[in-house]
């Protein structure tokens, strides 16, 4: 009996010593040598994506990844081919993970950026690289690379690409801006920010989730319905003698931000700059009076005038920029 009990205790101690809890090490806490190893692979990856070098991509990928190489890279390689992205990139976040079960669904919670990343680990050790690459200093794309340790080497098991942020703000941060606009009564500006936040919800396809996702979708759909119902176009500015017609409210993206664009048709020929400018003064007065749900204190407000021919087709346009 004593021998049996002793054997059970020894077995329990052995099993406990062999058991390893799942572990995730983030960013600067990761071993520097390992970070350098992965950095070299990421640099090679970006060079290969930029050049569409399938041989290098196959060398970096695992056997399973290479079986579906074309499908895996389909949504990743197009920003490089279209010139949106180059080899320039920086680490957004990175995680070294140790797992107890293979394969299994693993979850990482970002303490820095507030998202949850869920993926299937195909090895006892994985490394997740979240790499940011910018287009014209406006749009930030996220290239998410999941490496699995195969023997003594690290191989790509998964890769995705998506829009991470605009003007340095991700979905959660843009949503916060939308709520600020809404609280101030600027419903149209809130709507534009909600629409943008919605577009930023999948920087890594379905791998990354923000806790605000349901709220963003709910608030966008609610505001979209309200805008469509209450703020109709076209709208005739009847108090102005020339009767210009507001046709559309959209936005302009420049290097400093997203700003309102008010498009209208006018009976004044665009070549008559004096009359056109005088009419614009009246348009600004009427628009600011009737559209108080737009923030006209923004740095730029754009007005675009159109001429329409006898067949109702747009001939020419001219854009005015109001700088506050």
Regions found by a protein language model. Name each.
Residues 211-296:
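Intrinsically disordered, low-complexity segments enriched in Gly and acidic/Ser/Thr residues
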Residues 56-114, 200-227:
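Short solvent-exposed beta->alpha transition segments
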Residues 36-38, 123, 133-140, 169-174:
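Generic helix N-cap/helix-start motif at coil->alpha-helix transitions
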Residues 41-57, 178, 184-188:
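Short helix-adjacent coil turns
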Residues 18-51, 160-172:
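Short, low-complexity N-terminal intrinsically disordered segments enriched in polar/charged residues
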Residues 167-224:
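Alpha-helical protein-protein interaction scaffolds
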Residues 1-29:
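Bacterial Sec-dependent N-terminal signal peptides
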Residues 133-168, 252-261, 285-322:
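Short beta-strand edge/turn micro-motifs at domain boundaries
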